[in-house]
């Protein structure tokens, strides 16, 4: 184990941070590329498929990220144990995290496959409901491997080993892209399964990622000291409670955050299929860009958590400043690109020469410009929350997120979308108002937590 208790300057902290963040960003971007290709191929299958597939993808992502949030306690707790030299505890945390995954996946699969009533109630078109249902019935089988992979990923990055994640995700992404093309359009001897074929390729990629990382962790000798999978069948209620004590609020916050995006998608669907299609195009583009600050938030959780294990407060503040600053810088650059090339980006998804796509194109351009300004807020709130997770401060941020996302963001989205001429653009503006509130709240909370924890002889949440 490297001596992480040494003093780091800002430049040195940035180097250590980027050693984690760059491979993780590569992995997240590769994974987002899968969603990007899915969306492009859905567009090739028609505007109805694009709208339905986009809505179904948002639903699956909401469930998946809720599960990922609930097991997110693995990463900060393992990072703290790694920083404190508690080798045995690392394996215990990882094993119990996998038990949580199993207990979450079964009810999650049942919910995903029984959402017809919700879609009818929200005013979705019949075609959208039928196509979404066929996609979700397959994607439900990818829920367990997706969350289990996130659990193992949380362990491995907390041990400062991010490169295997990137290689595994890139390989699975290439498989998914080829599978999409073969199964979606009937190439290379496969039947043309349309949107169902895209779902089959996606769940196959989730299983490949999970099993590949599992094999790596079993095979890699430096990891054997942690006994990661010994006595896997033993439930440890005390450790389960610790994981859920930290991860539970993160999971609830994920429900609220992704629930905001999902509800916004329902709002857009109620405004019309072309508007929903435009929303899906911009959402997918933003999601690809969001993968970088998301990776940075994971790295921030690990760096802050490792310093937290050593009780080094100046280094914790440095890690926070580095992660938030780099995330804001990246999203600012990405926002400029969206402002400069909105039509070209939308043209990757939709045929700009098809008159049937005219309304979707016009709405998409207006939304893209709004997203360009909102990206910085998205990156800021995500990395600031990652810093708080590294300090194992998750319950108050959950409350702050509830107020910001639903009390402010959702209300603003509804009012601006349905009671002003802004329509779909208003829904996006309202969402970013919520993210702005979350950003301010999380930064305030970080300052407050730092003052409080530094005054304690042994800081613990």
UniProtKB/Swiss-Prot annotation:
Stored PANTHER family: FMN_FAD EXPORTER YEEO-RELATED (PTHR43298:SF2), MULTIDRUG RESISTANCE PROTEIN NORM-RELATED (PTHR43298)
Entry-linked CDD domains: MATE_NorM_like (cd13131)
Residues annotated as transmembrane: 17-37, 51-71, 98-118, 138-158, 165-185, 198-218, 243-263, 275-295, 320-340, 360-380, 398-418, 424-444
Keywords, alphabetical: Antiport, Cell inner membrane, Cell membrane, Ion transport, Membrane, Transmembrane, Transmembrane helix, Transport
CC annotations in GO: plasma membrane
Role description: Multidrug efflux pump.
Protein name per Swiss-Prot or TrEMBL: Probable multidrug resistance protein NorM
Membrane topology, as annotated: Multi-pass membrane protein
UniProt xrefs under InterPro entries: MATE_fam, MATE_MdtK, MdtK-like
One of the record's GO molecular function terms: antiporter activity
Organism: Synechocystis sp. (strain ATCC 27184 / PCC 6803 / Kazusa)
GO process terms (BP): monoatomic ion transport
Family assignment from sequence similarity: Belongs to the multi antimicrobial extrusion (MATE) (TC 2.A.66.1) family.
Subcellular location field: Cell inner membrane
This protein's record includes keyword Transmembrane: yes
């Amino acid at each position: 184990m490297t001596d992480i208790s040494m003093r780091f300057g800002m430049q040195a902290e940035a180097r250590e941070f980027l050693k984690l963040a760059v491979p993780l960003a590569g992995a997240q971007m590769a994974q987002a590329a899968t969603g990007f290709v899915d969306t492009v191929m859905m567009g090739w299958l028609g505007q109805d498929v694009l709208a339905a597939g986009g809505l179904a993808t948002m639903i699956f992502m909401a469930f998946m990220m809720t599960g990922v949030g609930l097991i997110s306690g693995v990463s900060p707790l393992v990072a703290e144990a790694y920083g404190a030299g508690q080798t045995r505890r690392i394996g215990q945390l990882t094993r119990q995290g996998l038990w949580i995954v199993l207990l979450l996946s079964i009810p999650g699969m049942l919910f995903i496959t029984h959402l017809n009533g919700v879609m009818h109630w929200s005013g979705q078109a019949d075609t959208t409901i039928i196509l979404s249902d066929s996609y979700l019935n397959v994607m439900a089988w990818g829920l367990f491997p997706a969350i289990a992979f996130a659990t193992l990923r949380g362990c491995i990055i907390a041990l400062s080993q991010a490169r295997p994640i990137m290689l595994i995700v890139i390989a699975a992404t290439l498989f998914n892209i080829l599978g999409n093309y073969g199964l979606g359009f009937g190439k290379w001897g496969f039947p043309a399964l349309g949107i169902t074929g895209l779902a089959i390729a996606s769940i196959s990629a989730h299983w490949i990622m999970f099993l590949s990382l599992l094999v790596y962790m079993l095979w890699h000798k430096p990891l054997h000291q942690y006994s990661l999978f010994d006595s896997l069948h033993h439930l440890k209620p005390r450790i389960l409670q610790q994981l859920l004590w930290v991860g539970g609020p993160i999971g609830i916050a994920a429900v609220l955050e992704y629930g905001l995006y999902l509800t916004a998608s329902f709002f857009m669907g109620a405004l019309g299929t072309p508007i929903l299609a435009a929303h899906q195009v911009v959402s997918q583009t933003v999601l690809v860009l969001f993968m970088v600050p998301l990776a940075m938030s994971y790295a921030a959780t690990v760096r802050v958590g490792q310093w937290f294990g050593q009780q080094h407060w100046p280094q914790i503040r440095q890690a926070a400043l580095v992660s938030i600053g780099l995330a804001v810088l990246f999203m600012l650059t990405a926002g400029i690109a969206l402002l400069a090339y909105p039509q070209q980006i939308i043209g990757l998804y939709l045929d700009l020469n098809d008159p049937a796509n005219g309304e979707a194109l016009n709405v998409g351009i207006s939304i893209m410009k709004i997203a360009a300004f909102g990206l910085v807020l998205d990156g800021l709130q995500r990395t600031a929350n990652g810093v708080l997770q590294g300090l194992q401060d998750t319950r108050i941020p959950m409350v702050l997120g509830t107020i910001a996302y639903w009390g402010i963001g959702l209300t603003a989205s509804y009012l601006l979308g349905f009671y002003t001429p802004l329509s779909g653009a208003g829904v996006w503006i309202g969402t970013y108002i919520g993210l702005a509130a979350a950003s301010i709240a999380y930064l305030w909370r970080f300052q407050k937590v730092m003052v409080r924890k530094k005054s304690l002889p042994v800081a613990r949440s």
